[in-house]
């Protein structure tokens, strides 16, 4: 009898200890999740979708392993052009690994680029249906980026991908959104991302009513020799032309280019290759002026 009483006492003590430490463990887990040291616990729907075996592995702290295997399966969906299944699988992946920007980015790329283009080119579908699916999957990809940013607000790569998506000429561009996304990419990249800084300017310059902000940014970027690429030089010239006041052509060209020959060649290519519809203010006038100056020599 004493033996069973001891067993009962031990069980009561264990249950009491578990009950007492449960709030502490829950609070500790919450803090670890907030700090990014642990993945959030799986919800019931996710457990059901990945199956009992995978759920057991994930609960054992190996959610990244499960996500990797599902990612391999998602590649099969890509090869089969089964876009709904691919979307479903990436929703599972990001539920398992919400702090991995890679999965958010790849999911967005598959949906906004691969799926959207595939649906647009499926000749067996009516034209209206193709266009609707094309737009729908572009937005699905954008939604993945937004959710990824919510989970990883300090990751510059997702902001950069969002900027690239919204600036793409074939994806119903919104240059205001693109400019802000690139600005945040540059900011979260601690000001070291020169490509994102230039992309910020390219987008901002195409937003109506943002001429002053664009020229201020262009001047700031041009102070850094790394940013003095051909397109920045030409864009700065076009923006300076808008605000030139009493300044002469010679002054404007000298500010943006090293010499007349370089200016003529860069402006010619900038004007000729303008599929992205960058500002062209003063470009034709400058090209004609440079041609006349060359003829005088």
Question: Where are each of the predicted segments found?
Answer:
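Hydrophobic membrane-insertion alpha-helices, especially the h-region
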Residues: 5-23
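Short coil/linker segments at helix-helix boundaries
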Residues: 23-155, 160-187, 198-204, 212-216
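Active-site or metal-binding loop neighborhoods of secreted/extracellular toxin and effector enzymes
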Residues: 207
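Terminal, low-structured helical/coil segments at or just beyond the last alpha-helical repeat
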Residues: 211-297
């Amino acid at each position: 009898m004493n033996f069973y009483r001891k067993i009962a006492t031990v069980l009561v003590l264990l249950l009491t200890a578990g009950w007492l430490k449960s709030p502490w463990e829950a609070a500790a887990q919450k803090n670890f999740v907030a700090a990014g040291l642990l993945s959030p616990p799986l919800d019931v729907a996710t457990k059901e979708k990945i199956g009992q075996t995978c759920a057991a592995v994930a609960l054992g702290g190996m959610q990244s392993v499960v996500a990797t295997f599902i990612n391999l399966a998602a590649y099969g969906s890509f090869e089969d052009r089964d876009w709904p299944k691919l979307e479903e699988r990436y929703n599972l992946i990001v539920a398992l690994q919400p702090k991995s920007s890679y999965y958010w980015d790849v999911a967005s790329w598959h949906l906004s680029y691969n799926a959207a283009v595939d649906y647009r080119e499926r000749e067996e579908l009516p034209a209206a249906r193709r266009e609707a699916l094309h737009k729908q999957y572009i937005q699905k990809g954008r939604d993945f980026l937004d959710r990824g940013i919510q989970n990883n607000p300090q990751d510059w790569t997702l902001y950069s991908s969002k900027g690239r998506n919204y600036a793409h000429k074939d994806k119903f561009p919104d240059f205001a959104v693109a400019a802000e996304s690139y600005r945040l990419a540059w900011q979260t990249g601690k000001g070291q991302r020169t490509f994102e800084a230039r992309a910020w300017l390219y987008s901002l310059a195409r937003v109506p009513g943002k001429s002053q902000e664009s020229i201020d940014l262009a001047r700031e970027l041009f102070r850094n020799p790394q940013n003095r690429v051909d397109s920045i030089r030409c864009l700065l010239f076009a923006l300076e032309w808008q605000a030139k006041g009493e300044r002469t052509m010679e002054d404007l060209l000298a500010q943006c280019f090293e010499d007349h020959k370089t200016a003529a060649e860069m402006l010619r290519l900038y004007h000729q290759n303008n599929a992205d519809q960058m500002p062209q203010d003063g470009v034709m006038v400058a090209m004609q002026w440079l041609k006349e100056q060359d003829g005088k020599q």
